[in-house]
């Protein structure tokens, strides 16, 4: 008789952020996790809420030890979905949750295994009642510890993982729960600490490699090495690792160019890791991992094209300044473009010396605005002629604008406008209804609303001015002629 499926409810289903991320997925995903031959897009903000190990952005991979189907179940649990498992899938999921630091899923698996131990399969009841059996718990014969078992105590020595299972029956009268006694909880805590302190990449007791995660976050693009372990590492073919994170606009089909991540839209900073799109791309590493996917040259502008432009403007001697990127040989351009060894392309004329280090130069200052008009008295320069004429009145003392409401006189129109505000009036006032207007155009539009028969004889638009101007007509020769030289 087959066992019923096990249902693990997720405690994250009520989180509004997780609900939003689950609806948007795979949109706005800033993490791409490779498990075996499958890729799983995810949001680093959601993963960081359940595990520090998973809360990293970028392209990274899991080694042997976790199957794609098991990781898909773990990811569904993290995104707030209830997971239904077959009896044989519970233990691999619990081991994956323990290895990746998803404590809530590991505890849910412990509770599910404890409930199953309380309700054994009726088909195995006959085996439980046989007196010659040393144990009355069928789960112990199946290799699946029940609720009466203590948690696993894992100790790693010399690259080997030894599992010691200590079982005992709790005192009668206490409810049967996972880790019922305080001693069992302490042992479980110690075993977790040992697992966290154990180096990554060692072999387990069954000879298989544990979960191995390679991350690439160094901005320089140089290859980052794992810890040096006494035991051998898995073969290179068993890992789908990326040396550098791929940019979202080049490799992720569910992301569009310039689309921000989920955490940036929600205005919440990430908890762990650094933005993977800030890392410097390394074309050589991409070609090594994804041989059939060629990255356009335009994506390498922060490394290749920028280096060429900076090298063209950082020559140590005046005679060796190249004319542009075309002066570099094809081999030098390729080396500067890839940048896998960190060496820079040499400047033209210095092939036998080390490459010139590219240094950012400040942008050139914009050209000064031409000021052809100069005052004949003080030499102050102006770009417009009327500015020079207004300034010249400072030397002559001329104040051609006079207020119609008081004896105040001003040197220019803007000063007269400010003065009229002290009277609470606009520069223009209708002579029929007394309405004020801030500009001559608005006064002309206002006067069109009056009938021409209402206007007094000899009326002109100047009748609405609250100021008068006594500026003389412009002479043929201005007292402040523009200088012949603009220097």
Curated annotation (Swiss-Prot):
Annotated family: Belongs to the krueppel C2H2-type zinc-finger protein family.
Tissues and organs where the protein is expressed, per its UniProt entry: Predominantly expressed in testis. Some isoforms are ubiquitously expressed.
Keyword annotations of the record: DNA-binding, Metal-binding, Nucleus, Repeat, Repressor, Transcription, Transcription regulation, Zinc, Zinc-finger
Protein name, entry field: Zinc finger and BTB domain-containing protein 32
GO molecular function: DNA binding; DNA-binding transcription factor activity, RNA polymerase II-specific; DNA-binding transcription repressor activity, RNA polymerase II-specific; RNA polymerase II cis-regulatory region sequence-specific DNA binding; sequence-specific double-stranded DNA binding; zinc ion binding
Skewed-composition ranges (Basic and acidic residues): 112-166
SUPFAM superfamilies noted in UniProt: beta-beta-alpha zinc fingers (SSF57667), POZ domain (SSF54695)
C2H2-type zinc finger segments: 373-395, 401-423, 428-450
Entry's free-text remark on domains: The C-terminal zinc finger domain functions as a transcriptional transactivator.
Major location category of this protein: nucleus
Origin organism lineage: Eukaryota, Metazoa, Chordata, Craniata, Vertebrata
Renumbered residue ranges of the record's region Disordered: 112-244, 308-371, 468-487
């Amino acid at each position: 008789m087959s066992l019923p499926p096990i249902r693990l409810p997720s405690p994250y289903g009520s989180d509004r952020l997780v609900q939003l991320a689950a609806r948007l997925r795979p949109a706005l995903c800033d993490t791409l996790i490779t498990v075996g031959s499958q890729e799983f897009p995810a949001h680093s903000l959601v993963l960081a809420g359940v595990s520090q190990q998973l809360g990293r952005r970028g392209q990274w991979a899991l080694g042997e030890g976790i199957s794609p189907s098991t990781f898909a179940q773990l990811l569904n649990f993290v995104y707030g979905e209830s997971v239904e498992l077959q009896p044989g899938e519970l233990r691999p999921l619990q081991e994956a949750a323990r290895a990746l630091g998803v404590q809530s899923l590991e505890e849910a698996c412990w509770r599910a295994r404890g409930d199953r131990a309380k309700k054994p399969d009726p088909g195995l009841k006959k085996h439980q009642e046989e007196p010659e059996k040393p144990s009355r718990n069928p789960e112990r014969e199946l290799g699946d510890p029940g609720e009466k078992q203590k948690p696993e105590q894992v100790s790693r020595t010399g690259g080997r993982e030894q599992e010691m299972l200590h079982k005992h029956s709790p005192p009668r009268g206490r409810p049967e729960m996972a880790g019922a006694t305080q001693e069992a909880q302490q042992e479980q805590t110690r075993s977790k600490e040992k697992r966290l302190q154990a180096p990554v990449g060692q072999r387990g007791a069954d000879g298989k490699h544990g979960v191995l995660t390679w991350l690439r976050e160094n901005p320089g693009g140089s290859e980052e090495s794992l810890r040096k372990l006494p035991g051998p590492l898995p073969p290179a073919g068993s890992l789908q690792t990326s040396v550098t994170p791929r940019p979202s606009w080049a490799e992720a089909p569910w992301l569009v160019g310039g689309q921000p991540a989920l955490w940036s839209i929600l205005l919440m900073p990430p908890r762990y890791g650094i933005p993977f799109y800030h890392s410097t791309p390394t074309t050589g590493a991409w070609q090594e991992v994804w041989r059939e996917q060629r990255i356009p040259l335009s994506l390498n502008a922060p490394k290749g094209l920028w280096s060429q432009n900076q090298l063209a403007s950082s020559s140590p001697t005046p005679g060796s300044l190249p004319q542009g990127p075309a002066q570099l040989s094809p081999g030098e351009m390729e080396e500067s473009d890839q940048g896998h060894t960190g060496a820079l392309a040499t400047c033209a004329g210095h092939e036998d010396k080390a490459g010139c280090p590219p240094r950012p130069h400040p942008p050139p200052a914009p050209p000064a605005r031409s000021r052809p008009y100069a005052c004949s008295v003080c030499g102050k320069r102006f770009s417009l002629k009327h500015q020079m004429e207004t300034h010249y009145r400072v030397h002559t003392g001329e104040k051609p604008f006079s207020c119609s409401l008081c004896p105040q006189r001003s040197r220019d129109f803007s000063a007269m406008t400010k003065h009229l505000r002290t009277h609470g009036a606009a520069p223009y006032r209708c002579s029929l209804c007394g309405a004020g207007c801030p500009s001559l155009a608005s006064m002309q539009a206002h006067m069109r609303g009056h009938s021409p028969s209402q206007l007094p004889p000899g009326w002109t638009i100047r009748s609405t001015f609250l100021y008068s101007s006594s500026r003389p007509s412009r002479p043929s020769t201005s007292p402040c002629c523009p200088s012949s030289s603009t220097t």
